[in-house]
Swiss-Prot record:
Database matches in Pfam families: XFP (PF03894), XFP_C (PF09363), XFP_N (PF09364)
Stated name of the protein: Probable phosphoketolase
InterPro entries (alphabetical): Phosphoketolase, THDP-binding, Transketo_C/PFOR_II, Xul5P/Fru6P_PKetolase, Xul5P/Fru6P_PKetolase_C, Xul5P/Fru6P_PKetolase_CS, Xul5P/Fru6P_PKetolase_N, Xul5P/Fru6P_PKetolase_ThDP_BS
Family under the similarity heading: Belongs to the XFP family.
Amino acid sequence: MPAKGPLTPQQLSLINRYWRAANYLSVGQIYLMKNPLLREPLQPEHIKPRLLGHWGTTPGLNFIYAHLNRIIQQRNANVIYICGPGHGGPGMVANTYLEGTYSEIYPAISEDEAGMERLFRQFSFPGGIPSHAAPETPGSIHEGGELGYALVHAYGAAFDNPDLVVACVVGDGEAETGALATSWHSNKFLNPARDGAVLPILHLNGYKIANPTVLARLSDDDLDNLFRGYGYEPFFVEGSEPADMHQKMAATLDTIFQRIQDIKKNADVHSPERPRWPMIILRSPKGWTGPKTVDGLVVENYWRAHEVPVANCRENDAHRKILEDWMKSYDPSDLFDEKGALKPELRALAPKGEARIGANPHANGGLLRKELHMPDFRQYAVNVTEPGAIEAQSTKILGDFLRDVMKLNETEKNFRIFGPDETASNRLGSVLEATNRVWMAETLDMDDHLAADGRVMEVLSEHLCQGWLEGYLLSGRHGFFSCYEAFIHIIDSMFNQHAKWLQVARELEWRKPISSLNYLLTSHVWRQDHNGFSHQDPGFVDLVANKSADIARVYFPPDANTLLWVGDHCLKTWNRVNVIVAGKQPEPQWLTMAEAEKHCEAGLGIWEWAGTEDGLEPDIVMACAGDVPTMETLAAVDLLRQSLPHLRIRVVNVVDLMVLQSPHQHPHGISDEEFDRMFTTNRPVIFAYHGYPYLIHRLVYKRTNHSNFHVRGFIEQGTTTTPFDMTVLNELDRFHLAMEAVERLPLGESVAKPLIDNFTEKLALHKDYIRQHGEDMPEIRDWKWTWPR
């Protein structure tokens, strides 16, 4: 009895043949390096010496791709495909090859037998392409190597793209990760009146690498209840018989795309309600259409299908016969013509032009990227008449600037701010004068700044903030992510993956540049005295510094005017990760805007107004990077100037940390000549650094004067205490810095000892005072820089 459904017998035959073609090409990529159409008996030399790749998920991915092609053609839909199980890379490559996109981008992989051989040979092969849905894969914005981020990327791409449908395959293994588990809640932030739609396709093929998956072992009733609780309407497509499954999938997609159209048509622009978005739960065998058994062991529909089901095809004649029979079961002569090209009636199933999934510009976001309309950051400048004379909250000033960035780009709708419930805490609350927080869930009368059309994305999940922003950037828009410094570590690995993506994408001419990922790390280690040790960790910049020099940028603006310059600069860059570390508490303001511009453009500079060298070679260099280290350095200089009035002191402040490297190591690096001019070749350098001291040593270790660098920073000492005590615990305070300077100078014991004793006594007084009064001493709280220019 023929399978019932919307497909005519001819349509059913065609879509099944197309699926067979994708499966054939997928198997060929894993196994073959010659004889791509099996026009001669399979020989050992036709098979790759190292078999790499993942078959188990791939036939399911190919099945979905074929049916998305049908719905795109039928409804003129605008669809991109996010492949959560990115290890099914052979399928994504195969499908973009079948639709013609792959050969357009890579002409050497031509649509003939020779091109097919090159397609097969290159996969997971030296000099070829990776095994996953990497940047080299047309249509991909998600590599899917590290699992957990598919669905959050899908939602990020859908925001502000009202005509886009993001089909997102979530593997049942990936569904067990924490990031994916919370991603289901993204539907509470998707506004049907202005955003696109996300179609989650939960692919339950039953197994991970060597274990069953949790969700695959739940009943349909439990799954239905689970996802209805999340706010979805699940549609089940289950089975293993191809004809029946094709009809079920076609009928389900027909229903779902109509449902999406109705949701968007009925959405009230002014007060949209949260709909129950559809999703698919697809149950199909792992390794579907592959060998049932190998060596008497079950393969299809079991974990053994996960990677390479038949492992010894070169050496083992029986295994080679299994592979040959498997590939011939797809009947390549029914799929490809004499030249090796896909037959015309099958090629007609693929969409045309930019409607093809592999050619959709939303998956090559740089094609759609528009520069932000930017206000003049100088308009927000703090009026600094004398260094340190006034205080300001630097991030609050930046918030005013970001508010107006938001206003100027309201028409384009291509800028959002992201944060884990910290926008107000991080003193960026001014942005809420221009927009609201996105919220599609229940709203109470007492709630403020919640709206369906808001442009501030706040949810208490750093994973969602990072993933939404990545999806938003990869599809051609701009964003800004503010976070407590210690808790940005939650997304360390997500940052790693994005940086790797950018590094590869930069080398692909066809991938156009996307906007940079911009972090503001605040509520930082030196001002987390009230929350304690758990909130004190400046190590994210160490991770960033490990990445490619073409990608990584780290900035430590010491005051509001430098922060404005850095913020403006970062929002104008592309294909980078910019990390800005700045405090939110009131702090001294050092530079005029003109001075700040000059200082930031150079990346570092000598603060002549703070030093006493008078054009001569200094006796000592006091260097600093970070707002609190800068203040403590200047306070130490104040002590030294009072105690040793004839001492020649140079003060160097570093904003762009990467200038410390050489130009051979980093494009921002300064020359050895400039470095020596700044830091001397033989004088002691006392360097007060915001983070872990060893990073500075690492950055400058090849410099002439490295042996004279004495770096102080966070040495993993923390608790709930006073702000100044945090610096004392880590020996970054003014007294320790001044003592270090005295000890490194050839002063003689008669001069040095009384000074060191005095500074040591001050530290003892500090310790007693805070334990008695619960706050820092007045001379610390009220200290100001008073030396005239």
